[in-house]
From Swiss-Prot:
Expression sites by tissue: Expression is at least 10-fold higher in tubers compared to photosynthetically active tissues.
Name assigned to this protein: Sucrose synthase
Pfam families noted in UniProt: Glycos_transf_1, GT-B_Sucrose_synth, SUS_EPBD, SUS_N
Single GO biological process annotation from the record: sucrose metabolic process
Catalytic activity: an NDP-alpha-D-glucose + D-fructose = a ribonucleoside 5'-diphosphate + sucrose + H(+)
Region named GT-B glycosyltransferase: 275-752
Keyword terms of this UniProt record: Glycosyltransferase, Transferase
Ion transport recorded as keyword: no
Purpose: Sucrose-cleaving enzyme that provides UDP-glucose and fructose for various metabolic pathways.
EC numbers on record: 2.4.1.13
Amino acid sequence: MAERVLTRVHSLRERVDATLAAHRNEILLFLSRIESHGKGILKPHELLAEFDAIRQDDKNKLNEHAFEELLKSTQEAIVLPPWVALAIRLRPGVWEYIRVNVNALVVEELSVPEYLQFKEELVDGASNGNFVLELDFEPFTASFPKPTLTKSIGNGVEFLNRHLSAKMFHDKESMTPLLEFLRAHHYKGKTMMLNDRIQNSNTLQNVLRKAEEYLIMLPPETPYFEFEHKFQEIGLEKGWGDTAERVLEMVCMLLDLLEAPDSCTLEKFLGRIPMVFNVVILSPHGYFAQENVLGYPDTGGQVVYILDQVPALEREMLKRIKEQGLDIIPRILIVTRLLPDAVGTTCGQRIEKVYGAEHSHILRVPFRTEKGIVRKWISRFEVWPYMETFIEDVAKEISAELQAKPDLIIGNYSEGNLAASLLAHKLGVTQCTIAHALEKTKYPDSDIYWKKFDEKYHFSSQFTADLIAMNHTDFIITSTFQEIAGSKDTVGQYESHMAFTMPGLYRVVHGINVFDPKFNIVSPGADINLYFSYSETEKRLTAFHPEIDELLYSDVENDEHLCVLKDRTKPILFTMARLDRVKNLTGLVEWYAKNPRLRGLVNLVVVGGDRRKESKDLEEQAEMKKMYELIETHNLNGQFRWISSQMNRVRNGELYRYIADTKGAFVQPAFYEAFGLTVVEAMTCGLPTFATNHGGPAEIIVHGKSGFHIDPYHGEQAADLLADFFEKCKKDPSHWETISMGGLKRIEEKYTWQIYSESLLTLAAVYGFWKHVSKLDRLEIRRYLEMFYALKYRKMAEAVPLAAE
């Protein structure tokens, strides 16, 4: 048997050099094609199109050195003749940079700062030799443990538990942080877990053994109060459990950890420690209310997410508190902006109880300036000058409401996460970040060309706020892997913040590490009271059917519905979203309009935008104009129905099921979707679903089994895929049932609020513990962020114009 020889892995530069040496003419021909584009940025599809355009013989020669594979890994090419620089993504979170001189055929490796400096020449012309502010967060996390495998990305808590269980409990001294952690637990002056009788780890172990011996003799259902005083005398307080059985489980788990620690036991033990009683959730922008707001500008999936999240979270908190043997009432406050002029909604009401919850409320605090309260709605892109004063007011309001500090602060979206960072910093509380969507990935090249976008979107403030929040927070929740680190071919939202530049402002050489164990994938679900299968006939809300029939099929055209459906026998192709550029509803209408086969098979119904009132949102105005033009140009009346945004979520659930009755399908055609809550809703109702392959839906749907992926950048192909599906269903009705059932099964396995709530509270416990035992106040990075906030962000925010009243 031949001896196996280990060979050195060649660097990227060496591989390109080898290709150059072997095939100079072919590589020169290709690079000349790239250079001919002139100064600018080429995207992956443009690079591959140029490669496809060269002769097959030349391609074959270059592929001897896997040149096409290298190109497929290239996320952008910067062309500044005679130089072409490539940003090559070897795998998620791992990048290298090179540049090639087309004239001299010389290859250079570039560091991140060198690549970004080269890229800045697109904007600045000659390289700016003056001092440029470089942001580098890597030194602050260099000593923290991190996984290195791609499969570990988004499983931060698992990695952290393995690390903690390996590092701790190996001798008496290593147990001290745990002892201090258990002794630190109290609520409004009441001691929990351990009292002053236990001063060291030896005493703790002895007490636990005594407790174990005593508990074994008791009937499992014995309530805690029957042995409460006995336990107090030996040093144990409330919080271990409500019955002898549960207390014994906790005691045995801790003894097992002290004897032979393992990550699963550690996570289970930490998840049962009483830690979270008061939660503050920040979501300032948009119209945040429970009725009559969905479809308003900046008001969509995030509002639904939080209103579904909170009742489920409260239920899990109540369950855990009961099982811990405590009589504490938890509180959840959703903090948003008070809008005095939002007529017809509760957005002007200071406090509002959350439906489906007993101890959760929406707390509204107004934006203020020196002139007083800001009364009107403000776009999410223009909130930045108000945030600092808003948080000062919020801190006072939540203190008055809770009469205590929150135990966990959860931010949502950019400004909510900045607010959470400021509040957590002020109060010294564990912080959780939920981005929902990071705008930098939605708008290509919005970093390098930020000045073009800033007047309208103020991305300089927003991207800076995102950087501050993601580096300040204790842990980050995402709905999908793609949100963090993309896929084999696409860059993740957080990954896009690893390195970028905004010329004239600053250069980010290390913004975030996607391998950081603060990242955790915790996917939401749909409210099971509103969204359930069309086949559950006994639960169906048939009282809504006359209204839904009117909405879909009436011959009346008005502000609520435009155009009519002439053939009621055809299935309905359905979509529902905000009417903005990224959601791409007009794109779907155009695909449909230009595909005669699809038009012959199905009717198209679009729910989005509000034609009942004049929109203040510029994007919505532009999309409305485009929609009217498509209807007129393609003569869609008769096959198409445009319905204004529907705000009744209960009826919307039945609307999905009503569409399913027609053997229709749901389409989510967005250019990018961070998660895709409507995708989950539609699948939960048994409606076959087609959704964008850019973002979260690519993970929610298993293509061909529980739905279908579509590429919004190739609308013709997407329309053909839809037509193929409906043609197949026409010939074989069981195909529709197969995809419907596949979607329902997928949801049941992965996307429920119960799974979500259990995970979130366990994360809060583990990261709270990690923060304590590692003395992880992260003072150094927080000081760095304070300076960045005060010297850079604040000036940007102040430059955003205040809204006219």
